[in-house]
Amino acid sequence: MNVLPFPCLRPAEDHVIEVLSQPIDTLASAGSILQAQEAGILLKDARPSYYLYENTAANGTCQTALIGICALESLVCDVAQSVEAAPSSACPALQCTPAPVTYKRQPVLDVILSAAQQGAPLYDLYDPARARHRIWHIGRTEAVEAIRTMVQQIPSVSDGSSGVLASMAAHARTARKEAQAAGTYTGREPFNYVLLALYPTDGAKTALPSMPVGFLAHQVAKL
């Protein structure tokens, strides 16, 4: 499984509530993104990085996911079959929330990710349902390379996205056809990659939490 670090587009720490309260159509429009960047409301991290998302429900249940991007074509067959079913549509400028997937727990990766959580989080807030949301940035070269090496050993993932992967695959097909028709397609375009939230599992099926829309975004189209 080749899950990569990426240059994330995310809210400035003092504007996070403002960004999270925006409708998704507003967040994903090119004009709004550019205006928000110029105003310092949205930031784009200079170096490709991984992120950790921790969700603690009001009942104390805590789940943590690694956030990165993955080439759509490299996803395993069970995921690929589900994404092919969606109709094509126009490609948004941003993928504003990651597609949640699960993988078999890797103890060494657990240790690496736990170490990353020892630092101060980028964001730490509660939603109206009293769920706590925390995010850590992993940008140190040594940590990024260690995580990249470990996730390559994950043999497969299972789709828990409830349509996010299907939607992004449909957008990618449309954008790919347009680029091919224009003679500009290279295969390296951002729309060929999907933002994933990878949750470890020990085999038992568990409902996956949803990250608030706009926390971490992957730019999939030119602005």
Say what each PLM segment does.
Residues 1-223:
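Surface-exposed, charge/polar-rich loops and edge strands
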